[in-house]
Amino acid sequence: MANDMESIKNAGGENNPASAQPLPRLWNANYIKVWSANFMIFFSFMLVMPLLPLYLSEQYGAGKHTIGLILFGYTITALVARLFSGYVVDSFPRRTVLLLSYSLFSFFFLGYLVGGPLLLFAIVRTLHGAPFGSTTVANSTVAIDVLHPQRRAEGIGFYGLSNNLATAISPSIGLYIYEVWGNFQAIFFLSFLFSLCGVIINSTVKFRQNKVIADT
């Protein structure tokens, strides 16, 4: 009888060391860094977003249709970039792809400071969508890499909150800063600084070596 009871306990996992092991840590250092970098992407992006129509109207006298086209151009290039970003991320070292695309996304904000004719601003703004699209794909891929398989679904859920949190607070902060300073250039430069922080954060992530896809 004693042997039978012991067998039942073992079958239930009471004395099974494997069943007593805790779940792997979700908020590891790499995940926190990638999460923070993603927050910086959307924070810097949304910091200027609500002010762009006002900027284009006041600085260039642009009409509603022109403003809509310029904002639409950013979205289109971001969507097109995302179509190819997955392949690029899998075909080349992820660290290189992420840091390069993130750096381009960051430095494009400096292009807003150049001024010049409306056409030049429209070109800069439209092209800016490409590194935004590729950066979001690359950063999400790295987030998956640094998560333990047992915590991956949960981790992706929390990762998405970084987008939501940045989108919720950044526009209000941008509008408040503009009301205090009354300077569009300051907002553009702050967006550059916040996005540059994201680049620096990601540069400290320990990337897992991905198997590069070879064409056959």
What function would you assign to each model-found segment?
Residues 27-70:
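Helix-loop boundary and gating motifs at the non-cytosolic
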Residues 75-79, 83, 167-168:
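Residue-level signature of mid-helix packing/kink "hotspots" within the transmembrane helices
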Residues 96-110:
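Structural signature of the two symmetry-related core transmembrane helices
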Residues 119-127:
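Paired small-residue
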Residues 126-162:
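Cytoplasmic helix-loop-helix junction between adjacent transmembrane helices
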Residues 193-214:
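C-terminal membrane-cytosol helix-exit motif in multi-pass small-molecule transporters
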